[in-house]
Amino acid sequence: MPEQALLEEVVDKVRPLLGQGKVANYIPALANVDAGKLGIAVTTIDGETIGAGDYLEPFSIQSISKVFSLTLALTLYEETEIWSRVGKEPSGHSFNSLVQVELERGKPRNPFINAGALVIADLLQSRLGAPKHRMLELVRALSQNDKVCFDKQVADSEYQHSARNAAIAYLMKSFGNFQGDVDTVLRTYFHYCALKMNCADLSRAMLYLANRGKTLDGTELISQVQTRQLNALLATSGLYDGAGEFAYRVGMPGKSGVGGGIIAVIPGELSVCVWSPELDNQGNSLAGTAMLEHLSQRLGRSIF
């Protein structure tokens, strides 16, 4: 288990990087976040959580939610039903690319770009009567925090700026790879992205990725094989176009969001969440990546 002093050291180490990135500004609710925030939390497979910095302050998890939605889909569908509609390959294009959807005839490259996450949301909408409520139940149980909620302001703001995601959904629908009502699925998708959680919540919630699919209370959420496969996808596609750089520097499966959060895992040991709202050119937390790099170096841990 990393010691408290190490996490404090990690936060202090990256503080000089503040001011070098840019906060996401495509919706006001994200643009107004204090850019100077820094937080880190670690949860070990024995269930202990420690943190440093602003690790208890909630933030918009954005694309980190795509890990939860894919996990939920894996509990509801046969794997062939999922992977016949979305691929497992890195994208190489922007996370909201229309060009790639067109070129690949409506099948997204992976579940962590917007097109892929929209297909997963479409699957959940088709199978669940109340997909937003089911997601909230899941993340509250995983994080052991009943106060986790959706930020309605963020969800509404995302919906008001939804033209590109709607275009992606309709393009996939034209190829027969989107079954539900586009507007309904978009509203569900934006609620997922608008989940508010803190670093401690997320490090606890993602522990199943480090613990062979078992949650904090020992329940098997997904199988050991599915967990290994999900971690492989996170290692290759979890950081937008920065996945290779992240693997090189950090050496952990991870998933980022434009709210400035990144989750990562060391299988068999721990899950970690960092948060710093300023992003690099790939849309990943600049100081957050540096925190994870420093942590992995100090722990001497990497999956490679």
Curated annotation (Swiss-Prot):
Q: List the GO molecular function terms.
A: glutaminase activity
Q: Which organism is it from?
A: Shewanella sp. (strain ANA-3)
Q: EC annotation?
A: 3.5.1.2
Q: Which residues cross the membrane?
A: none
Report the sequence similarity comment from the record.
Belongs to the glutaminase family.
Single GO BP term: glutamate biosynthetic process
- Recite the lineage of the species: Bacteria, Pseudomonadati, Pseudomonadota, Gammaproteobacteria, Alteromonadales
Please indicate which superkingdom the organism of origin belongs to: Bacteria
Q: Which NCBIfam families does the entry link to?
A: Gln_ase, PRK00971.1-1, PRK00971.1-2
Which InterPro entries does the UniProt record give? Beta-lactam/transpept-like, Glutaminase
Q: Which residues bind substrate?
A: 63, 114, 158, 165, 189, 240, 258
Q: What is this protein called?
A: Glutaminase
Q: Which reaction does it catalyse?
A: L-glutamine + H2O = L-glutamate + NH4(+)
Q: Which UniProt keywords apply?
A: Hydrolase
